[in-house]
A protein has these predicted regions:
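N-terminal and secondary-structure boundary signal
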Residues: 1-276
Length: 276
């Protein structure tokens, strides 16, 4: 299913470049007791990449993104209450190896990226993290995930983390991000206060949001969390700050498309309570 999203929280349509984002869900990816089913997750990611790149096979899509000669940093997220699932890290690494990237030229890291030789010498990055609300940024999504690439993260917390887009212009990451994967297996849709976590506001959405444009991926993710708040509370209950950094990344830093009207959202798989 293909949809063009409405304006939502992020602005009005204008005649400018568009972006493509794939949302894929599978009601079986969280098995008994919420355990991630690795092979189902692999098939979800593969189908998303194939659809995003318009290729005949998943591996052909991966080969459009990465070369065997690349040095690849997988920028994950280790926040203890809702980290990137290790199964998702594993299936990403599996496909990089399948493309022919040497094992020694692949690493997965979060808070140690500035001291990690693979990341410091990376020719390509893959950005992967869970979708959740965030005290300083409104939402914790792909743009926010690169805050560990600076030695002073707190300096980027002003005005709803509006300066986050600037990090993407620094040489350590500029132009290197080949794919953004927002893990929406169990997103957190509401929270107030620093490091807030409450399982009442986490739900088994069982999805992945995938794209080459981090701004568009984040805009879709923020829209999903907003839609869930409306469904849960009967209104869009306010966060500590609105996720204005997504629009700033578009308007000021020109990193991608924040306008939901200019995002082609391709929805695959399980459609029950898809919300957007």
């Amino acid at each position: 299913m293909v949809a063009t999203l409405g304006p939502g929280i992020l602005g009005e349509a204008r005649a400018e470049p568009t972006a493509k984002v794939v949302l894929i869900r599978n009601r079986g990816v969280l098995g008994d007791q919420g355990r991630v089913q690795t092979e189902i997750l692999q098939s979800m990611l593969d189908e998303a990449v194939k659809t995003l790149l318009g290729t005949n096979s998943p591996l052909e899509g991966w080969r459009k993104l990465f070369k065997s000669s690349d040095v690849v940093g997988i920028k994950s997220n280790t926040w203890a209450r809702l980290p990137t699932p290790m199964e998702l890290e594993a299936v990403i690494k599996r496909r990089l190896l399948d493309v022919g990237v040497a094992d020694k030229n692949i690493d997965i890291d979060d808070r140690g990226v500035l001291n990690n030789p693979v990341f410091l010498n990376a020719t390509a990055l893959l950005n992967v993290r869970p979708l959740r609300t965030h005290h300083w940024a409104g939402v914790g999504t792909c743009l926010k995930n690169y805050i560990q690439f600076v030695p002073n993260p707190s300096a980027y917390h002003d005005e709803g983390c509006s300066p986050l887009g600037k990090i993407w212009t620094y040489p350590v990451v500029k132009g290197k991000t080949r794919l953004n994967v927002l893990c929406a297996l169990t997103p957190q849709f509401y929270g107030r206060g620093a490091n807030f976590f409450d399982r009442r506001y986490v739900w088994p959405y069982q999805g992945l949001i995938v794209g080459t444009d981090p701004v568009a991926v984040d805009a879709v993710g923020a829209h999903l969390l907003q839609a869930k708040r409306v469904a849960f509370f009967g209104e869009d209950r306010a966060l500590d700050v609105p996720p204005i950094h997504i629009m700033v990344a578009d308007k000021t830093y020109h990193l991608g498309v924040s306008d939901l009207n200019r995002i082609e959202l391709i929805k695959l798989g399980w459609g029950e309570e898809v919300l957007i």
